[in-house]
Amino acid sequence: MAASAAALRRSLAGAQQGRPFGPPVAGSSEFPALARRSTVSIAQGEERRKNVYTALQAIDRELREKMKGKRYVVIKPNFVNVFNQLASSHADAMRGILDYLSESFQGPVVIAESSAGDTRRGFDNFRFQALTREYARQQVKLIDLNDEAKFETVALLDADLHIVPCRIAARLVDPEAFVISSAVLKTHNTVIASLSIKNMVLGAPLHAPNSVRPSWSDKRKYHVGLRQTHYNMMVTAQRLDWGASLIDGFEGMEGNGPSSGTPVASRIAIASADYVAADRVAAETMGMDPEWLGYVKYCGQLGLGQFDPARIDVIGAKIADVQKKYRMHPDIDRELQWRGPMTELTPNLGWTHALGDERRG
């Protein structure tokens, strides 16, 4: 018994100094690798609408398979700022998606968003209303998820690492809907980059309709600490598990994203039936290390999608040919602190102290 305890103390001490715990148990892995391959398409050109259509058409077979049995499609745009077009989804990106769906899906289409601001104002400012007329045959409707006020609940961690309930839009987890995350290629002020996962998981939480007082917003429950944010995003992605991702990088955003950065003329669109693979490839097109994106890596480790580049097939344009070095947010050093040791709480807790951990907080 004493020998076993001493061995465990040595193993723990090695881990604390950056050395591995030791050889893995034969046949086991902390996070089993996802064996299946995933495909990500990249389209590049001088027309946003055409890029989006081309990127989706390139993975048509995969998308049609996932759309089987679905009653309707939900397109989830990004309206992080209902006044700044650069920060938000463009109507021409919607047209590219709707052009593709007109050929591949027989059923109504809903464009649904839960902006942190006034979603209806975003529909007006970015001229989404015209889409309902142009695509009347597809019965396109615009829905403010905050006004719809139907929700399910997911458990998150708060700033004190206690669990709290969060209301997420029921329509985004409707088993009868094929959900497309229509994101924008942007840097971010907390989680390094805002891509298809970020678009979904921070668009899903609801806030009070504008007519309701006192107001409330469950989106705030994600902004409770760097580590908690990445974890909470993973938990929410696991619950949502949508069908396809489309990332519009015709004009990306660098610097002070996701709302106030400056434009980058990447002139691309990225599409995949695997949102983890889509976000990994998107990060590479921005010239950043995908390992920086904790929430994307966590989703990959959980098996929600493919994070291993050796198992991702990129079709269309090559990453190296479209890659641009995006300028990161000014707070990038702070944002990356999630990767290091946790110093917010003393590590000298419970059984580690009993086994000889003499660290002091």
Model-assigned labels for residue ranges:
Residues 1-361:
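N-terminal and secondary-structure boundary signal
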